[in-house]
């Protein structure tokens, strides 16, 4: 059963510029995500769009969540997946979310993410 959906569209250039600051990287991305971003800066916008979409799916936005508590990684085939920690993990557990499905699309200028929470 679907528990929630979230979508986000973000400008790649804005995220790339923000990533020039270590404080932004540390606040928004886990160590594993930072490794991914160092290898491919475009992943920063993709991941941030997923984080925004997950926060919307949970129904709070970032008012009560920390972006780094939503970790976005890729499996060996490149499929994105999400790990939740802290308040994001607790909220998902309270809502009975057992799986989060993620889709990312991007162009040179924009990254888009769509997520579905499922019981």
Label the predicted regions.
Residues 1-119:
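Core catalytic alpha/beta fold that binds nucleotide/phospho-ligands
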């Amino acid at each position: 059963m679907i528990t929630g959906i979230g979508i986000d569209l973000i400008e790649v250039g804005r995220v790339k510029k923000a990533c020039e600051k270590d404080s932004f990287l540390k606040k928004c991305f886990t160590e594993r995500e930072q490794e991914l971003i160092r290898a491919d800066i475009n992943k920063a916008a993709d991941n941030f769009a997923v984080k925004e979409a997950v926060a919307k799916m949970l129904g709070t936005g970032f008012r009560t969540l920390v972006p780094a508590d939503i970790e976005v990684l890729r499996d060996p085939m490149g499929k994105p997946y999400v790990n939740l920690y802290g308040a994001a993990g607790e909220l998902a557990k309270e809502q009975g979310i057992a799986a989060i499905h993620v889709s990312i699309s991007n162009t040179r200028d924009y990254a888009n993410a769509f997520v579905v929470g499922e019981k």
